[in-house]
Amino acid sequence: YEITTRLVGSEMCIRDRIALVKGYDHNFVIDDYEAGKVQKIAEVVDEKALRSMEVYTDLPGVQLYTGNNMVPELGKGDALYPCRGGICLETQFFPNCARQEGFIKPVVTPEKPFTSTTIYKFVN
């Protein structure tokens, strides 16, 4: 799937794969990825609250997850947090990258430790 500007939830449970996991739990490829370069890869906008979150990373992928299997829970001020009541953007290498031809493979050794940068910037 290609992610462009859209309302999260507008396509939930419509496409076969999204219907299978009852929401989003998918890795997306950063098209203009450059190794070692921190760049903006996503923005989540809450138009009601007039705020947004920008995501920056130096990794080649991002997992979009919408809490598909979470049990509804009462939170602060007795607010109900329902299944799919939130969104998570997890920057990462691609799932199963060690076994896939052509995927970037992170190699970690004592001489070459893993370092990465991810920034979640909240904007009003």
Where are these regions (language model features)?
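Single conserved hydrophobic/aromatic residue that forms the stacking wall/gate
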Residues: 1-14
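Generic alpha-helix signal with a bias toward terminal, lower-confidence helices
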Residues: 9, 56, 65-67, 74-76, ...
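Acidic/His-leaning functional-site neighborhoods
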Residues: 19, 23, 31-33, 37-94
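C-terminal or internal capping secondary-structure element at the end of a domain, subdomain, or sheet
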Residues: 87, 92-94, 98, 104-124
